[in-house]
Amino acid sequence: ILRRVHDALEAVDMLDYAKSAPHMLSGGQKQRIAIAGMLAIEPQVLVLDEATAMLDPLGRKDILRIVKDLNRKKGITVIMITQYMEEAVIADRVIVMNEGLVAFEGTPAEVFRRGTELRKINLDVPPMVELRDDLAASGIIKPCNAMTVEEMANELCPLLLKI
């Protein structure tokens, strides 16, 4: 079991804090320790409910990186419940719930094409999706599926090089 705990702490970059008092850790560090606790039991599926709530942007980014790594490198299925639509961008599949029912589902690209419907149920689209849609509506870029800063940069850089 010590080996599994060691490996779990290493997976979430918290090995250096193994002997730290919990009250001395930041919110993001506590979340990573909680995830490590789940990893130590070697689950096939990990369910995270608002895992990034009340974290600063850097803490949120760290948790999302860890979640992505768990899925891609360790093959763990991660079910992530979140109210932050920009977090859903990293998912393979998104299920949008409204009043306890499935409103719609699909890939992030499919779901975020439905910005008007998302807003009707009081959900936002990720900022890059909103920027993308505004730029496309203004004719500045062609309609595309860019959802992250990197993807948007890939769309905009060729245009800037033409100027």
Please provide the spans of the model-predicted regions.
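Catalytic Walker B motif of ABC-type/P-loop ATPase nucleotide-binding domains
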Residues: 46-49
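Conserved ABC ATPase "signature" region
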Residues: 2-17
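Conserved ABC ATPase signature
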Residues: 21-25, 29
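Hydrophobic anchor residue at the start of the ABC signature
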Residues: 35
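Conserved catalytic motifs of ABC-family nucleotide-binding domains
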Residues: 42
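ABC ATPase "signature
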Residues: 105-106
